[in-house]
Every structure is written in C-alpha cells, then in structure tokens.
C-alpha cells in the first residue's frame, strides 16, 4: 500500500516492517536479508526506521538473527531493532547476547496488551524497563472484542474473528465475555463507549509509560478496517490525552480491574500468552509452557 503512494518522503514518516519465521529461510541471516529487501522494494524506499523479529524461530539461532540485524544497522538499512511475541526470558537473553557480542540492542517491543489481557505487566515490562526498551501495545481493543460488537460467545460476527478462526480461542472465551459484561455495564452507566474507555485506560491508567518523564516512549498501535473507525479511534485517543477529562471514573476503573481478575483466574483456559514459541538456541525452552488457550488456537 505504501509503495503505491506518490512521492513518499522517507523522512516524513516512521516506517516499520517485520521478518517472520514462516517465510523462506525464516529468521536465518539469509531469510532476514531477503525479507527486508522484499519490504523495501514493496514500499519503494531504501531504508526503514524499525525492523522487528515478529516472533521466535524454533529452527534458527537468536544470536545469528541479532548479528544480522546489527549488520543492517551498520549498513544504514534499518535504524531501530524491534522484537515481538518473545518471552521475557528470551528478551533478556537478547539483551545479554547483544552486550556480550557488542551488537546493537533492540529498543522497541511490540506486544499484546489491552484491558482483557495484561500478561506483560508482571513479567515482560520489567525486563524492558531495565534495558531501556519501549513497548508498543497491539490488539488494544482485543481484536474488536472491546468495541461492543461481540457480546455473545456463541455468535461469531463479521470481522477478524470470522476471517481468522485461530483468533477465536485467544478472545472468544466464557471468561472474556463474562468480563465484557462488567465493562459494558460500567461504561453504559458512565455514558462512555467501551472503545473510548479502553483507549483511556491504556493511555491514562495502564502500565504503559506514555509521555513519561523517564522517556520510556511507550505507544499504542491503533488499527482500523475503515477510515471511519480510524477517525473514531484517533478521537478517543485524543480525548484520553485531555489533562482534565482523560482519566476514567472510578466505577469504570473498578470494572476493568474486576474483569481482569475474572480472566486471570479462569481455570479453563486463562488469558492468551503474550509470547509465541522460542528460538532454536534458547536454553531451558522445554520448561516454557504456552498454556491451554495457545494450544487451542494452534489446533484450529
């Protein structure tokens, strides 16, 4: 899409792309170089600001991947190294390897985070903070669950859940819908949409460091399937940033907290994990358990 825009000025916007282990040669040096070249050609640019490892590659070495990313930084092809969907222990290992081998370190992590899934708070975010790495939240509306469109576990409506069945076990769970009822009720009482409440929670009440004095530079990945959705999401973010009125009423905050407790303590599946698999050279990888909800998604 970006490649079709006329006169795209590379330094006028921040460009990011990813390398995925499912592509030919995965996250091997050859695979990473092939994928960055494909992205550059598609966008018709010579460099990108951010280049992410989308998720661990269980067939290739993390160290080899990091060495290749360091070379791309030195060559000027990329500016910033990012990671996504890695376990906290492997993220820490990435920093340790970079320090040991004198490599450019990851400075941004893109991860699953929203009011219905806060798994990164206790485990991942401390690792990022200790290593000066920012966090960008994806799925801020739980893939659309927090829009209020999906309010019955038995009805799969049009959208991401209909078009991507492996998303169903991530969010379409009895615990999530029980939690949604609490949030919906509190939002209706406060006359706030769930979309706006979710963005206000993320930007004003969550563990993210948005515009913090410490410069942590966290962010939220705002998605949309239409221009109308994008405009509404941006308006909600704008209202969240309002110094006087951006914070949520206490009853809505209480509902978000109670909702997360329901999901966190669900014995059937629990919250979907923020990480996927592990690299081939990850020590102790056998002890990492992704849990029932991830296994259910893989079975689809």
Enumerate the language-model features and the residues they cover.
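Glycine/proline-rich, positively charged
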Residues: 23-119, 123, 133
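Terminal-tail/helix-coil boundary detector
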Residues: 130, 159-178, 182-185, 189, ...
């Amino acid at each position: 899409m970006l490649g079709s825009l006329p006169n795209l000025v590379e330094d006028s916007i921040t460009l990011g792309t990813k390398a995925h282990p499912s592509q030919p040669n995965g996250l091997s040096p050859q695979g990473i170089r092939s994928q960055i070249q494909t992205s550059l050609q598609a966008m018709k640019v010579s460099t990108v600001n951010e280049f992410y490892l989308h998720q661990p590659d269980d067939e290739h070495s993390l160290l080899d991947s990091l060495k290749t990313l360091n070379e791309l930084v030195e060559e000027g092809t990329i500016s910033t190294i990012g990671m996504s969907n890695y376990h906290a222990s492997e993220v820490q290992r990435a920093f340790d390897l970079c320090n040991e081998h004198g490599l450019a370190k990851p400075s941004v992590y893109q991860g699953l985070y929203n009011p219905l899934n806060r798994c990164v708070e206790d485990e991942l975010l401390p690792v990022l903070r200790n290593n000066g790495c920012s966090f960008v939240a994806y799925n801020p509306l739980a893939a659309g669950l927090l829009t209020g469109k999906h309010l019955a576990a038995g009805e799969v409506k049009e959208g991401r859940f209909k078009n991507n069945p492996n998303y169903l076990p991530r969010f379409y769970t009895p615990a999530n819908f029980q939690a949604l009822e609490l949030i919906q009720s509190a939002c209706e009482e406060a006359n706030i949409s769930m979309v706006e409440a979710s963005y206000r929670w993320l930007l004003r009440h969550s563990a993210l460091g948005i515009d913090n004095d410490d410069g942590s530079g966290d962010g939220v990945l705002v998605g949309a399937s239409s221009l109308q959705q994008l405009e509404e999401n941006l308006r909600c973010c704008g209202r969240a940033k309002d110094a006087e009125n951006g914070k949520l009423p206490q009853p809505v905050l209480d509902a978000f907290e109670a909702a997360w407790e329901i999901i966190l303590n669900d014995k059937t599946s629990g919250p979907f994990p923020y990480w996927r698999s592990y690299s081939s050279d990850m020590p102790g990888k056998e002890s990492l358990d992704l849990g029932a909800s991830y296994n259910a998604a893989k079975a689809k």
